């Protein structure tokens, strides 16, 4: 009987395979030692520092120890909760906090961070988290350290390394209460505006819905435009004060328009609407020119307009005649009348069915004493918009001639009376 043939086997030393899920021990101290040793060798030559950091990324685990890396570059060592150094013995003076407190030095440090994050893109998120943390630790830093961090943050916001959403950390209740947030914001915005300008700052703030929150840098009892304006103007940031004031005005305008439309749709008496608008004008320092534009827009949005050109003019005249007393209450200045004329021109141009209604609307408002001769003549002569001007000027030609003749007649009558 044939014996079953044995299969050949491989013999030799067996190696123990490492478990795939066995993770390397988290050891930030060893990482810290490597970075600090390297920084000690480079000294304060920031070009050399940037090169060292660039090269070290290939050998050290930046992804894992991002927080430790940024702690060292900013504070000189690992930070404990609250902002103190975790180990005061292991630290380096090649860091933001140990550097000179001036804009030029902070600009040089900003370049170090820029180069590092451009080289290792994955550090972007870690760096943002680090800055958010540092802002929450502000009370744990000295005034000089806060100033340096503020300048650096402003520069990094200006060049796009940081996103303006990091400013959320400044709204921390304790930081606000003790005035730390506002003082920090002064230095930050100064360096930010120095790098760019207020318009660029405004765009960045708007992107993260921070444009209307700057007053939250102060406690609730001091959250007024007046207080903000005084504080930042005295600190040399008049452009920021004006920006916030403008933002408040824009917000007030939107609120005014919304309320106006609601009052009109309810059919509130004009005297009540006029009283409300005048109070809002006074409270929010809104000009009559701005208000007349808002009222015009609100009046025109309260009705469903006929799509037929031959019918819309009649509908418009009927509708606007009803609202003439309201409009007349806010055309007490020549400039307001001119603003209204331009708004009418713009509306008639943008809404093609109204192209032939322009002259009829102007005549209606003239008869209703919403508009007077002088602004109409000025509009006709040189103050009109380019939009559809040939059409509208032609429409107005006969009426303007009539106005001029009427004006001449009244002048000659006045002379005869003299």
UniProtKB/Swiss-Prot annotation:
GO terms for cellular component: cytoplasm. Coiled coil: none annotated. Residues 1-14 have a biased composition (Polar residues). Keywords: Activator, Transcription, Transcription regulation, Translation regulation. Gene3D superfamilies: 1.25.40.180. Residues 1-25 are annotated as: Disordered. Residues 246-413 form the W2 domain. SMART domains: eIF5C. GO terms for biological process: regulation of translational initiation. It holds the Pfam family W2. Belongs to the BZW family. Translation initiation regulator which may repress repeat-associated non-AUG (RAN) initiated translation probably by acting as a competitive inhibitor of eukaryotic translation initiation factor 5 (EIF5) function. Enhances histone H4 gene transcription but does not seem to bind DNA directly. PANTHER family: BASIC LEUCINE ZIPPER AND W2 DOMAIN-CONTAINING PROTEIN, EIF5-MIMIC PROTEIN 2. This is eIF5-mimic protein 2. The lineage of its organism: Eukaryota, Metazoa, Chordata, Craniata, Vertebrata. The gene is BZW1.
């Amino acid at each position: 009987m044939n014996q079953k043939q044995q299969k050949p086997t491989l013999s030799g030393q067996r190696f123990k395979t490492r478990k795939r899920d066995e993770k390397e021990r988290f050891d930030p101290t060893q990482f810290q030692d490597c970075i600090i040793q390297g920084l000690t060798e480079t000294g304060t030559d920031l070009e050399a520092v940037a090169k060292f950091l660039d090269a070290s990324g290939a050998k050290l685990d930046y992804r894992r120890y991002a927080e430790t890396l940024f702690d060292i570059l900013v504070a000189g060592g690992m930070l404990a909760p609250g902002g103190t150094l975790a180990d005061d013995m292991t630290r380096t003076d090649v860091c933001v906090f140990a550097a000179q407190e001036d804009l030029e030095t902070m600009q040089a440090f900003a370049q170090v961070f820029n180069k590092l994050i451009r080289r290792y893109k994955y550090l972007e998120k870690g760096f943002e988290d680090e800055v958010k943390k540092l802002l929450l630790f502000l009370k744990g830093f000295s005034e000089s350290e806060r100033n340096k961090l503020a300048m650096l943050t402003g520069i990094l916001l200006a060049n796009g390394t940081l996103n303006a959403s990091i400013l959320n950390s400044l709204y921390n209740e304790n930081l606000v209460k003790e005035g730390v947030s506002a003082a920090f914001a002064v230095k930050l915005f100064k360096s930010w505006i120095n790098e760019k300008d207020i318009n660029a700052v405004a765009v960045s703030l708007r992107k993260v819905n921070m444009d209307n929150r700057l007053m939250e840098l102060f406690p609730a009892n001091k959250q007024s435009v007046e207080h903000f304006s005084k504080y930042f103007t005295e600190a040399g940031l008049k452009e920021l004060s004006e920006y916030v004031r403008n933002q408040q005005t824009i917000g007030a305008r939107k609120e005014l328009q919304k309320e106006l439309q609601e009052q009109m749709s309810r059919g509130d008496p004009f005297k009540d609407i006029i009283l409300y608008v005048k109070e809002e004008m006074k409270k929010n320092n809104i000009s009559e020119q701005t208000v007349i534009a808002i009222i015009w827009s609100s009046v025109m949005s309260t009705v469903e307009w006929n799509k037929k050109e031959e019918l819309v003019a009649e509908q418009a005249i009927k509708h606007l005649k009803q609202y003439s007393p309201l409009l007349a209450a806010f055309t007490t200045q020549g400039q307001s009348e001119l603003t209204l004329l331009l708004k009418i021109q713009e509306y008639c141009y943008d809404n093609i069915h109204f192209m032939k209604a322009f002259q009829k609307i102007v005549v209606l408002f003239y008869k209703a004493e919403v508009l007077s001769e002088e602004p109409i003549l000025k509009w006709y002569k040189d103050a009109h918009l380019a939009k559809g001007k040939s059409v509208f000027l032609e429409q107005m030609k006969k009426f303007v001639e009539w106005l001029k003749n009427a004006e001449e007649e009244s002048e000659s009558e006045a002379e005869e009376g003299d």
